[in-house]
């Protein structure tokens, strides 16, 4: 144990925050941080509810600064609720820069993925906004591809899970990353 950083990633609406709250409500092994909350400390959300990020580079720099501050402050392993692939202001999927993973010291990535129809339903219930199902599917495939790339270039481990993943299995995955 001791200050490992694992990113829990997935498309908007896959249920990352719910998954973490459901599994870690009474847990003290990990510190769970939200990338959007860390960015929000210094910058008002600018996605206008459409889940598009208007300044990817600036957001990542803010996130990196805040994340490194948190890593210095806590001694437990950190689970970061965030993204490795997002929609930019033009609606095009964009990968989070590789440099972020290196500078932040990300030890591993856990991808939470689910059925496209279920994700679309969650998006509608939560935001009243549903991304095209083809885009959701493409984003999930791009996430997997990017994880493979980060592993082959930098040896950043990854694992794909779904919402049925139990707490004990999740902990074992974190330990292996």
Which ranges hold each PLM region?
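Phosphate-binding P-loop
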Residues: 1-3
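Hydrophobic anchor at the beta1->P-loop junction of P-loop NTPases
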Residues: 8
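Conserved substrate/cofactor phosphate-moiety recognition/catalytic segment
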Residues: 21-63
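Walker A (P-loop) phosphate-binding loop of P-loop NTPases
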Residues: 13
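Loop/turn-to-beta-strand initiation segments
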Residues: 74-82
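ATP-dependent NMP and nucleoside kinases share a basic, alpha-helical "lid"
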Residues: 82-126
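Conserved lysine of the Walker
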Residues: 16
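Small-molecule kinase domains that catalyze NTP-dependent phosphoryl transfer to phosphate-bearing small molecules
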Residues: 129-169
């Amino acid at each position: 144990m001791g200050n490992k950083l694992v990113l829990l990633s997935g498309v908007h609406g896959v249920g990352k925050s719910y998954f973490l709250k459901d599994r870690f409500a009474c847990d003290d092994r990990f510190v769970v941080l939200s990338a959007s909350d860390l960015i929000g400390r210094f910058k008002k959300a600018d996605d206008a509810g459409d889940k598009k990020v208007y300044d990817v580079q600036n957001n990542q720099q803010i996130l990196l600064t805040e994340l490194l501050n948190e890593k210095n402050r806590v001694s437990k392993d950190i689970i970061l609720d965030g993204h490795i692939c997002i929609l930019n202001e033009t609606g095009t999927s964009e990968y989070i820069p590789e440099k972020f993973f290196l500078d932040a010291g990300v030890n591993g990535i856990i991808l939470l993925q689910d059925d496209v129809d279920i994700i679309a339903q969650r998006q509608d219930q939560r935001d009243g906004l549903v991304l095209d199902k083809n885009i959701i599917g493409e984003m999930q495939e791009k996430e997997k591809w990017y994880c493979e790339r980060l592993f082959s270039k930098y040896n950043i481990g990854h694992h794909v899970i779904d919402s049925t993943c139990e707490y004990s299995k999740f902990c074992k995955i974190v330990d292996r990353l």
